[in-house]
Amino acid sequence: MVSIPVLKPRTTPAADADGALRTTRRLTGWGRTAPTTATVLRTADLDVIAEAVRTAGPRGVVARGLGRSYGDPAQNAGGLVVDMTALDRIHSIDVESAVADVDAGCSLDTLLRAVVPHGLWVPVLPGTRQVTVGGAIGADIHGGNHHTQGTFTRHVLSMDLLTADGQVRTLTPDGPERELFLATTGGMGLTGIVLRAKIRLDRVETSYFIADVEQATDFGDMLERLQRNDEDYTYSKTWFDSVTKGEHMGRGFLLRGSSAKLEDLPPELRKDPLKFDAPQLARFPDLFPSGMLNRLSAKALNEFYYRKSKTKSGVVQNITQFYHLLDLFADWNRAYGPDGFLQYQFVVPFERADLLRASMEAIVDSGHISALNVLKRFGDANDAPLSFPTRGYTLAVDLPVKKGLGQLCDLLDEMVLDAGGRLYLAKDSRTTADRFARMYPQLPAWRKVRDAVDPERKFASDQSRRLQLVTG
């Protein structure tokens, strides 16, 4: 076993005698909408966290990681929020068995930087590495390789869950508390607080990707290319132009690839094939006004991006180029201005691919603009009742907040429901309890497991109240 040195928790000024820092903070999700105020507890002391859970007031408690959920699942107006970023140690990495034992507050970026030099890789990554392990479990995140690797929790061997009674339970996918494991998977922190997890890693020869880029002339061409040979690639995603109307609506490109083998690299990269090349260039200042993204600026951006992405094959790319372009810029969400934005993401069955174009037409006709549009194919669903991915197409669009956005999203909700689809809890910030219940028919089964482990409803969030996830 190769042991990584323990990472010390970040220092916290003005901490209490028990090492905990308690503050009152205004919190939002990554979309910077619907701010609420809560008491925030930040500590690496598990006993302090357990006591805070046991003594939580009537507004309850919820855990929060790096705040990358777009909506309100890690907010708790008038209640307690446990900031997990102090609990960020990597306890060990077993290179032989390819297993990492990590705290829930450890980010995927930190974990990757630790394991890549040993020829290991985190098997499922979302669109950013700035997500904690606990958040990855709570949202059951997915990546561009869902069709080959499933969701993040498919690779979780065990997790330690702090429940409402202050006890810590070790859960496994096939253990005696399998139902609680599955309820925690995608359960948005409402079954308890994940403290620690063991993650099964993949083996890689290099830290690079070998990628193919294909231009598509419209939505139909895009879908045809995806269907033709998507299974030949480990990772697959597309970007498309949502501003151009008419016959070229949906033009864009497919970016697909797999982990590069040593033989795929040019000589200069073979000297250090496991170098983790993921720089951060700049931090967005909080100076941008709302409304900068309009039809004119979005059209120019779409035109540039489309023409830049020419068809080519066998391109060697680092993780930033291939997967995490937005991680080049810290706080990039500030680019939408103080009014913020929401990301609308849904999945529909393959046979309802018609909804993809129909939804984009509805957005264009409404006068709203989205410059960041991503389309992917999902593989089969898992057994977790609130896990989002299910077999079909998933579409994600970023929409700046402006007048009429609520009505547009209500329309999209009904279109998604009519097609047998559903929304992603980690992205949602505004749908209704009724619509959510219709999208997730296993919600009653999830509530039964959740209520059994938390009969006093101690775990709660702004999202859980809005969607009536926790009842009684």
What function would you assign to each model-found segment?
Residues 1-472:
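Noncatalytic alpha-helical scaffold of FAD-dependent oxidoreductases
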